[in-house]
Amino acid sequence: PSASPAPGTAAPSTGGASASAAALRIGICQIVSHPSLDAIRQGFKDGMKAAGYAEGQAVTYDEQNPQGDQATLTSIAGTFKSQELDLVLAITTPAAQAMAQAITDRPIVFAGVTDPVSTKLVASWDAPGGNLTGTSDFPPIEAQLALVKRVAPAAKTVGMIYSSSEANASVQVDLAKAAAAKAGLTLVTKGIVNSSEVQQAAEALAADAFFVSNDNTVVSAIESVIQVAEQRKVPVIASDPDSLKRGATAAYAVDQYRMGYNAAKIAVRILAKGQKPAAIPVEK
């Protein structure tokens, strides 16, 4: 008889057998529901399937979503810690931070994290150094702000709403200020705590255009920004293609699905090849 995989490793599925004790168990934590993050999750699962890990056969998933609630997120991290999981996928910075705080003895692959170094998830981009690595959605903010001027050449000010409690969001505000200045724009900002404040924040910003970064709280309520923008007849520049379907004027975007797919490739390197997250560079 063939040997069973070692703990934390598994051979790809080649047949139609039902899930067995040899199947990998992966916990997935997605901070909130919106199309871009859904695309990351689907990309990951498709990437695993393409590598031979069919869901329900060679891998099973425990998928959790706290819908932005920090207490629920902490609880999910504790649950994952107590389970016999082979790997955790953390989608976005808050999810990765919660998982990293709770889980130190198993690999964590993140996706949709803007700057894992400044948020102290990894020691460096090239040598993470701990039990985390993954794929980053570090945004092309200069190109995004330049797009504002292309769409609205007469614009002088651009409004940006951000989650004041999320480290990634603060990083993006600083980058956006510099990029706006380079594009000949003045950035005006408004911080929020949750998605219910997005419309009020948009109404409070006197701006010739709105820029929505890949701030998950704001993106989850982008319709509120679009409503205010339409009333004022000003454009909304987004950072993800799905926001175009929801009414944004234009977008300069990172491919979220591909980010999840590539995170699966990293997971396979860890689970099938025995590589350590500490030595796998974070992918931009």
Regions found by a protein language model. Give the residues of each.
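Short hydrophobic alpha-helices and adjacent helix-cap/hinge residues
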Residues: 6-15, 19-284
